[in-house]
Amino acid sequence: MNRTILNRSYGEFFGREKWDYFSTLTYKYPKSIKRNRIEMDRLTKYFKKQAIAFSMVWVTEWHISGTSTHSHLLTKGVDVTLIDKYWSKSNLGYKKFNDHKVYERDKGADFYIAKYIDKEVDYYTFGI
């Protein structure tokens, strides 16, 4: 399948949700794809323990250096301070290196996250 069509299809699918934020989470130390999956699964469990109704999709991307990963997320129902609190408390990174932007629906989910999926690193959805 053509990557442009694939990205557009993912964007349309993820665009059905009314997201609150687009976030980029950066690690303090290098993390492999496998380790990133473990940390992102823990973040998901943390949200569940907070007993909040939420939706999330995250995509992993390699840093330009190729030695570590970082994650891009779309979230709904999650206060970004909760993300930063978890990230710092778990010693994964500093909140000043995390980036949170209010989701602008008119840009579409493909603008925010679908473009990373075709890099075929790793991704996960919850609640959608």
Regions found by a protein language model. Name each.
Residues 1-67, 77-128:
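Right-hand nucleic-acid polymerase module
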Residues 70:
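Conserved, short, structured surface segments that act as functional micro-motifs
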Residues 73-74:
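Long, low-complexity, serine/threonine/proline-rich intrinsically disordered regulatory regions
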